C-alpha cells in the first residue's frame, strides 16, 4: 500500500530528467507534498516560494509564459484558499500550470479540518478552463503524472493527491474516461480518488449479504467528466450512487447529477460529507462517523436500494 502523493514525489523527478521544460514550485511543505524530491535531482528548476501560496500562483503563471510546464504543490485546502489568484492568474489566463493539492479529504485525520481539502473539487469545478484529476492509487497517479508531463497542456489542471497509503490499483488511465473495475447489473457505484478501495470492499459486502450485483466505476477525471459512462450505467443498472471523501456539494456527486439531469434522469444517491465540518480524529473513526467506511457505505446502499 502506497500513497498517491508518493507517486508524485518519486515520478516527477524522473519525468523532469526526460522533459527539461518541467519546473517545480514549493510553498514550504515539500517534505509533506513530496515535491522536495525534485529539488534534489533538478535544483536549477526548483523554486522555494515559502509560506506564500498566492505569490507562488502568480510566479507559476509568469514562468509558464516562457514555455515551461509548472507543477506547484501545497495542501489542497491552502491552494483553494487563494481562489482569486487561481481564478485570475491561471484559469482566466488559461496557463499550462498544474496545481498539486495534497492531504485532501477526511483521511488526514487528526490534522483537523483546517488542513483537510473538503471543498477543493467544488471550487475548481466552477472555474472555466480548469481540469481536475483525482487518481485512486499509486500506479494510477504515476500514469496521471506521465500524462501531465508528456501532454502539451492547453489549460490549468488541479491534481488531487492523498496522504494515506491505499491499495495499489493498477488500472489503465485515459484522460476524461472512467473505468469499470467490477461489473454488476443492479447497482452502480461511482468512486473517485483514494476511497476507491473502501468502495470496492463495500461492493463485496453488498454482494455477499444480498442478491444484488454491484458495478464499481472509478472516475479519475472529474472535469471533464465522462458523460458516456454515466449515461451507460444509468441505462443498464437500477440505481446509482456516488462516493467521495469530499463534500457532497459540488463534487463527484454533483458532476454525475448534472449529467443525469441533462441526458438521462435517474435516481442518484450521493455519499460523502453532508455539508458539515468534521472533527479531528483518526481517519477510520471519521470514516465510520460520516458514513464512508466500507461497512457504512454498504449499509447505506443496501438500505436505499432495498427500502
Language-model features: where?
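Thiamine diphosphate
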Residues: 1-158, 165, ...
Amino acid at each position: 500500500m502506497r500513497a498517491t502523493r508518493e507517486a508524485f514525489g518519486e515520478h516527477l523527478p524522473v519525468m523532469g530528467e526526460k522533459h527539461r521544460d518541467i519546473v517545480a514550485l514549493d510553498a514550504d511543505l515539500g517534505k509533506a507534498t513530496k515535491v522536495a524530491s525534485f529539488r534534489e535531482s533538478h535544483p536549477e528548476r526548483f523554486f522555494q516560494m515559502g509560506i506564500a501560496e498566492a505569490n507562488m500562483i502568480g510566479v507559476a503563471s509568469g514562468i509558464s509564459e516562457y514555455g515551461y510546464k509548472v507543477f506547484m504543490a501545497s495542501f489542497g485546502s491552502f491552494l483553494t484558499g487563494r481562489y482569486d489568484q487561481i481564478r485570475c492568474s491561471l484559469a482566466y489566463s488559461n496557463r499550462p500550470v498544474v496545481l498539486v493539492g495534497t492531504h485532501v479529504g477526511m483521511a488526514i485525520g487528526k490534522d483537523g479540518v483546517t488542513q483537510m481539502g473538503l471543498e477543493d473539487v467544488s471550487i475548481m469545478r466552477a472555474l472555466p478552463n480548469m481540469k481536475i484529476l483525482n487518481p485512486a492509487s499509486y500506479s494510477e497517479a504515476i500514469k496521471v503524472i506521465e500524462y501531465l508531463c508528456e501532454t502539451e497542456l492547453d489549460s490549468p489542471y488541479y491534481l488531487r493527491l492523498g496522504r494515506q497509503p491505499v491499495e495499489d490499483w493498477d488500472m489503465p488511465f485515459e484522460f476524461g474516461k472512467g473505468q469499470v473495475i467490477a461489473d454488476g447489473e443492479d447497482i452502480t457505484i461511482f468512486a473517485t480518488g483514494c476511497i476507491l478501495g473502501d468502495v470496492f470492499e463495500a461492493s463485496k459486502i453488498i454482494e455477499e449479504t444480498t442478491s444484488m450485483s454491484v458495478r464499481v466505476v472509478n472516475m479519475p477525471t472529474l472535469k471533464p467528466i465522462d458523460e458516456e459512462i454515466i449515461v451507460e450505467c444509468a441505462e443498464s443498472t437500477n440505481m446509482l450512487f456516488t462516493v467521495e471523501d469530499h463534500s457532497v456539494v459540488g463534487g463527484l456527486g454533483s458532476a454525475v447529477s448534472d449529467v443525469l439531469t441533462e441526458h438521462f434522469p435517474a435516481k442518484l444517491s450521493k455519499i460523502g460529507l453532508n455539508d458539515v465540518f468534521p472533527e479531528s480524529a483518526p481517519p477510520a473513526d471519521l470514516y465510520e462517523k460520516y458514513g464512508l467506511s466500507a461497512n457504512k457505505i454498504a449499509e447505506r446502499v443496501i438500505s436505499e436500494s432495498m427500502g
